[in-house]
Amino acid sequence: MKALLQRVGAARVEVGGEIVGSIDRGLLVLVGVEPEDGERCAAKMLHKLLNYRVFGDAEGKMNRSLADVQGGLLLVSQFTLAANTRSGLRPSFSSAAPPAQGEAVFEHLVKLARVAHPQVATGRFGADMQVHLVNDGPVTFLLEC
């Protein structure tokens, strides 16, 4: 599983002009599921997302986590993160999980997040989404499980 997290001042996801998920200050996380990923990987990734220290403390150092600042968590599925881009000029998606597995693992991540964190929003799996964000920093990290 790959998770591209971005610290945001605000973010929202629209599908067909309708807002399906939005947060204020927090993390926008694009999630790509790979064939070897399962529930254990989802749990490990959620722990990282909630506890990774990307927010500034009183001295401006990145010492505070999403859980510490009680920020929003916007999870958006993005199978293109799992693409193989090592050769050629066209990405190969054979390294991404099949859609049914990708959806199951992503939904498990969302379910765990909603139990563990008070502010969770999502995009819509498999939909053509427009993601709007106010990038804070910018601060962006690629996490893998």
From Swiss-Prot:
Gene Ontology terms for molecular function: D-tyrosyl-tRNA(Tyr) deacylase activity; Gly-tRNA(Ala) deacylase activity; Ser(Gly)-tRNA(Ala) hydrolase activity; tRNA binding
Annotated source species: Pseudomonas paraeruginosa (strain DSM 24068 / PA7) (Pseudomonas aeruginosa (strain PA7))
Domain of life: Bacteria
Lineage, highest ranks first: Bacteria, Pseudomonadati, Pseudomonadota, Gammaproteobacteria, Pseudomonadales
An annotated GO BP: D-amino acid catabolic process
Gene Ontology cellular-component terms listed: cytoplasm
Subunit structure: Homodimer.
Official protein name in the record: D-aminoacyl-tRNA deacylase
Keywords, in A-Z order: Cytoplasm, Hydrolase, RNA-binding, tRNA-binding
Major location (coarse): cytoplasm
Domain remarks in the Swiss-Prot or TrEMBL record: A Gly-cisPro motif from one monomer fits into the active site of the other monomer to allow specific chiral rejection of L-amino acids.
Record-listed E.C. numbers: 3.1.1.96
Record motif Gly-cisPro motif, important for rejection of L-amino acids, residues: 137-138
Enzyme class: hydrolase
